[in-house]
Every structure is written in C-alpha cells, then in structure tokens.
C-alpha cells in the first residue's frame, strides 16, 4: 500500500512537471543613461572646473527621509560622463487599466558644485520616472526633470536622457 501511494505521488509530480506553460517571459527595459551638460560642458566630469563634484540621489517615496538611490557613473564612446540607473527607487502605482499598469518613482538629485576653495553650492533637482507594465513588457515610459518632460520612450531605442542646465 505504501508503494502504491509513493508511486502515485511520483506519477503526479512527473505529470505536473511535463505540463506546457504558455505564458511568455516579461521583457524588462528599465536601464537609464542620464547626461547633464551646460553650454556644451560635461557637468558630470569632476575634472572640469565648474562641473559637479558630487551627485547624490534620494528616493522621495522611500521608507525614511534619507533613502539613497544607487546609480553608477560611466563614460560613453565619446568619453562623456553619464549616470546609469538600473533600479532602486520605490515605485508607486498611479494608474491601472486592464492588463496595463503605470508606476512612478520620484527622486531628488543633489548636485554639489565647488564655487571656490571654501564654498560649495548644492542644487536640488527633481526627477520623476514613469514605468509601464504589461504582461509582456516592463519599461521606462516617460521622465520629467524639474517638471519638464525630458524623455518619452521610443520602442527599440535606448533610454537616454539629456539634461541641459
């Protein structure tokens, strides 16, 4: 009797593992490359006078007032500096219709610039990121920087945001 029960369990799991899964895998497109320049000057190059010496990101929707958001700085083929953001800020659902959902992340950017040997200036900017999620695709859809639309997704194109100060 024990053998029959064991055999039934093995057959059940064998049949369960052979089932056909018709669900497709959701594609994710959320990597952002953010460039900041002023009058043609790469503001993220710390070696250029007048550029930002430090940049910090803080998640407005984070659990605490101080919720840092991680990002990487990198250089492109033209040796321009940019900030690469993968994920990390909390996403809040703002709209849902059928199988499509819209999420929003709100991030403060603190941009420190050296004025002279003893004085730094810290600017505070706001970036709002909208994501669209469907069963097949999760992607960045729009980005506002200081309440100005700076990016709208074009299918097949990289998520590059260019900020001019």
Residue ranges and their predicted role:
Residues 1-4:
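Positively charged n-region of N-terminal signal peptides that target proteins for export
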Residues 35-50:
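Short amphipathic, basic-aromatic surface patches that mediate peripheral association
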Residues 52-116:
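Tryptophan-paired
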Residues 117-165:
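Glycine-rich, aromatic-bearing surface loops/beta-hairpins
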Residues 28, 46-55:
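Short coil-to-beta strand junction motifs in C2/discoidin
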Residues 24-38:
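A short, Gly/Thr-enriched small/hydrophobic beta-strand-prone motif that recurs across taxa
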Residues 19-22:
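Bacterial signal peptide processing site
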Residues 14-17:
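C-terminal motif of bacterial Sec signal peptides marking the signal peptidase cleavage site
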């Amino acid at each position: 009797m024990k053998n029959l029960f064991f055999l039934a369990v093995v057959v059940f799991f064998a049949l369960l593992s052979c089932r056909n899964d018709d669900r497709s895998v959701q594609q994710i497109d959320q990597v952002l490359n953010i460039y900041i320049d002023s009058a043609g000057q790469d503001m993220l190059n710390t070696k250029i006078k007048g550029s930002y010496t430090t940049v910090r990101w803080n998640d407005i929707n984070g659990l605490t007032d101080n919720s840092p958001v991680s990002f990487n700085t990198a250089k492109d083929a033209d040796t321009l500096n940019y900030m690469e953001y993968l994920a990390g800020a909390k996403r809040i659902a703002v709209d849902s219709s059928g199988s499509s959902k819209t999420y929003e992340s709100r991030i403060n950017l603190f941009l420190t610039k050296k004025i002279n040997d003893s004085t730094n200036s810290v600017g505070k900017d706001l970036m709002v990121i909208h994501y669209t999620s469907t069963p097949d695709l999760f992607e960045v859809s729009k980005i506002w920087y200081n309440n100005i639309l700076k990016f709208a997704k074009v299918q097949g194109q990289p998520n590059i945001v260019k900020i001019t100060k």
